A protein has these predicted regions:
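Extracellular beta-rich repeat passengers
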Residues: 1-144
């Protein structure tokens, strides 16, 4: 229904089937409307998120079902800022909050230090949290 910045699912009915959906994303900024979620993970999907911002929405992060079992292994956050009306919701809010508390994550208006990107050669090292909007938006974007 278009109410999530990212909604990621593995296979419904067989959530642990491989390959598991597990994107790696760095330097992303998601700004959603007040009635939306920034990220929703469910049905066994993972997410490696680095140097990113989840901002403005009703909820920053919702994790459900088999995805909860991936906290800290198939779900990792490093250098992530959560600043929404409610930062965390899901099937086990305490487990999600414990994961965030032990990660390089800041909740609120001040971003955390930049995280360490995977040394796989795909990402370029930088010290920016979120998208570097001013350097790339040019004349083709709006609302930023």
């Amino acid at each position: 229904t278009g109410d999530n910045g990212i909604e990621a699912d593995n296979r419904e009915g067989d959530e642990l089937v491989t390959p598991v959906s597990m994107p790696s994303i760095a330097n992303m900024t998601i700004v959603v409307r007040d009635d939306q979620r920034a990220v929703r993970l469910r049905r066994g999907t993972g997410l490696m998120l680095f140097n990113s911002e989840l901002l403005n929405g009703d909820t920053c992060l919702r994790i459900q079902g088999e995805s909860l079992n991936l906290l800290g292994s198939g779900i990792t956050f490093d250098g992530v800022q959560l600043d929404c009306a409610t930062n965390v919701e899901g099937d086990d809010v305490d487990a999600i909050q414990s994961f965030l508390d032990s990660s390089n994550v800041a909740e609120g208006a001040n971003p955390p230090p930049a995280g360490t990107l995977p040394a796989d050669g795909f990402f370029e090292a930088n010290s920016t949290i979120g998208a570097d909007v001013d350097s790339w938006k040019g004349n083709w974007t709006f609302g930023i």
